[in-house]
Amino acid sequence: MKKVFFFLATAICAFSTLSEAKTKEKTVTVDDILPAGNIIVNKVSADTVYVETDLRDTDRFWFYWGMRVRGAEGKTLVFSFKEKSVGARGPVVTSDKGKTYRYSGGKYGKTFTYTFGPKEKEVWFYECHPYLPKDWAKFTKGLNKKLFTTGILCKTRTGNEIPMATFGNLSGNAKYKIVMTGRHHASESIANFAIEGIIENFCADSELGQWLRENVELSVVPFVDYDGVINGDQGKGRTPHDHNRDYTVFLYPETKAVSELYAEKIPVIILDMHCPWIAGKGSELVHCPMLDPKRIPDNAAEDLFSTIVEKNASGLPYKASNNIPFGVSWNTSTNYSSGLSCRKWAVLNLEGLRICRCFEIPFANAQGVEVNPESTREFGRSLAISLAEFLQTAE
């Protein structure tokens, strides 16, 4: 059941239903009733709201959250989290129910302070820029319908249909095939804007777009953990394991469907788009956790691709030296003890792969550059340039 918390100045009133508090004073409410909402309110003391992320079926602390605040016009409130859940530029804020977003300002930590304007009757706060199926629908609606096809990957265990789309050469006989996935971990939303940028260049009225449409078929699954995305789940660390550790036993129909898509397409390139830890050392830069070099189909090709991506990167900086080699930091076999990732399954089961890559897009800050929808789209556009250059170089 959704829970709404009401408080009046220093008084605390918590209700487990959506009934209104009957009072003559201005009532402030804090709840998770917004798209992909996720918050637990523990208490309110004076002008401080004590909150924490709703882990649900996640087996460890994770930092995603989204909350709605109403009735706080003219007030200054402090939001204090149980764990470090505020990103490098503070929360993402919208005062118009998701039409526009901005960073409120701040730094990585447990708290943020927000002064509500006199007309801000309802404000949504998120840990990061959200990206939901309605955003995907809006994006694809703006594209030339002749340049792509849409379909359904499969149905989730709850019966939701997972969208997919194909761009580029639609003949079925493209010289090169690429499969790109997003949201194996439900809360890693900023990476979807990079997916948009890649697609934009596949559809562009340009020499690059023309070459891609003649030579490359791009299959895209924007939301692997679709249910988790719409429900506002953490996604990472689900029990008994999350979607990107499900390529051993296939508990989730969507991961089985992705593996079948790989087997059907026999891609030369696989891209799996992710986001790292919320902030801090190693998490505020675009990077790629590399596979075991003993398993990589073509180490020289992977090195070449990194060099090309670094050269062409725009919007967000990327340096090949920031990649995490296998066996370093968290990128070890222990991290995959609960099951294979999509990439590990692919290199074990597919022939002809040249590139099998995960890109980690930071949530808010990339080597000092602000990570936002447009800077991330621009990075995606540069990735499309790099994909074309790599394939042309490899011919």
Residue ranges and their predicted role:
Residues 366-395:
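His/Asp/Glu-rich mid-to-C-terminal helical/loop segments that flank catalytic regions of hydrolases
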Residues 107-146:
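Extended acidic/polar, glycine-enriched regions
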